[in-house]
């Protein structure tokens, strides 16, 4: 146990996009960190494409050059990290890079209930990265919602409401204002920013105080 009974409870803000394979890993791996440190967590859906457009357009150049050694090694490391975490990974598939606007809006529609959002997020990650399904397909996403007991059609309807669109935009802008440049962006106690699955040991250390 990394936290004493009278220690202040640390807060983790986890900005994420369902299209990111590294976020799939981090979302699953961070659960143990949260349990160990007894931190409170806020799951914050955002649109990583909006982040890239604002502050990290070099990502698109890298995607355009698939023979770049860094890109090749990143895919190798990605699968090694998945094996280390004992997570199934079917990636990349024909759906990559997937448009994530629809699923991220659906996440925003659930943000008021963090436990339900967490369950939906896991189911959506599994659909895309473990099962190779297209999360830009409304039928797939309705099925994902139904798999955890939600009304898929109702959630799809909520996802196109102006307030939900505004929420996704606001989350993305907030993440950018805090220094985000990709997914996942993890912020401890609204102060320390961490990025990526490989920085989870640092997140653990920061949360433990």
Label each PLM-derived region with a short phrase.
Residues 24-128:
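Structural alpha/beta surface segment adjacent to cysteine/selenocysteine redox centers
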Residues 1-2, 106:
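Short, charged low-complexity linear motifs
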Residues 3-44, 112-115, 119, 123-209:
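C-terminal cap of thioredoxin/glutaredoxin-like
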């Amino acid at each position: 146990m990394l936290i004493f009974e009278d220690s202040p409870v640390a807060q983790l803000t986890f900005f994420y996009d369902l299209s990111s394979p590294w976020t799939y890993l981090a979302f699953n791996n961070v659960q143990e960190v949260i349990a160990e440190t007894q931190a409170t967590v806020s799951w914050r859906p955002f649109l990583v494409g909006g982040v890239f457009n604002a502050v990290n357009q070099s990502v698109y150049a890298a995607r355009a050059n698939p023979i770049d050694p860094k890109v090749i090694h990143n895919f190798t490391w990605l699968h090694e990290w998945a094996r280390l975490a004992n997570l199934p990974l079917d990636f990349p598939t024909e759906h990559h890079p997937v448009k994530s606007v629809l699923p991220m809006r659906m996440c925003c529609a659930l943000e008021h209930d963090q436990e339900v959002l967490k369950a939906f997020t896991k189911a959506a990650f599994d659909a895309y990265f473990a099962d190779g399904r297209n999360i830009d397909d409304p039928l797939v996403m309705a099925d994902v919602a139904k798999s955890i007991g939600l009304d898929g059609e109702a959630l799809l309807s909520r996802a196109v409401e102006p307030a939900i669109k505004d929420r996704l935009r606001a989350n993305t802008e907030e993440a950018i204002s805090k220094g985000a440049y990709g997914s996942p962006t993890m912020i401890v106690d609204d102060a320390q920013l961490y990025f990526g699955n490989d920085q989870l040991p640092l997140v653990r250390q920061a949360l433990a105080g």
